[in-house]
């Protein structure tokens, strides 16, 4: 252990759990289950200027500054990852989140999971259209295309129509 993290011992000893003698200096702060990471999920940064939700299909692990969530089993047949990402990254949901989020600098917001998990999600007759457009956005991005504004515009209009705004 000393060979790998010994040079960080003083810094690690300053963690709250070490000061309270709940953990030894070389122990992880919080244990993690591999299965949580090794699955399809939506990932997003802890701090951001705007909503930046992305689908992870590569079983990625992340640092403390990246959070993720997955669709609970009882909702897997109701909502798709593509639909959720399309909704969450929309202009409407970006504004909606910023109204409720903690601002941490002039333009940055705190995307702490307790706030993100309270975001209301709807499903109506525009579901399939939003999902299809979101899939097109993802395909363009996978192909290295950066111009997705036409698709985002359509998604935003569908969401506004669904919400009556």
Set out the residue ranges of the language-model regions.
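Polybasic, glycine- and aromatic-enriched phosphate-binding surface used to engage nucleic acids
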Residues: 1-128
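Non-catalytic DNA-recognition/assembly elements of restriction-modification systems
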Residues: 123-165
């Amino acid at each position: 252990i000393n060979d790998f993290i010994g040079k960080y011992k003083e810094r690690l000893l300053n963690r709250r759990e070490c000061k309270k003698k709940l953990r030894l200096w070389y122990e992880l702060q919080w244990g993690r289950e591999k299965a949580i990471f090794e699955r399809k999920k939506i990932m997003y940064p802890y701090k951001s200027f705007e909503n930046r939700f992305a689908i992870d299909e590569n079983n990625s692990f992340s640092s403390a500054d990246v959070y993720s969530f997955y669709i609970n089993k009882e909702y897997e047949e109701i909502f798709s990852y593509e639909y959720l990402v399309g909704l969450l990254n929309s202009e409407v949901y970006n504004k909606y989140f910023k109204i409720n989020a903690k601002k941490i600098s002039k333009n940055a917001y705190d995307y702490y999971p307790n706030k993100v998990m309270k975001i209301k999600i709807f499903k109506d007759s525009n579901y399939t259209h939003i999902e299809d457009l979101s899939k097109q956005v993802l395909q363009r991005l996978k192909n290295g295309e950066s111009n997705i504004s036409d698709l985002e515009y359509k998604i935003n209009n569908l969401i506004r129509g669904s919400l009556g705004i």
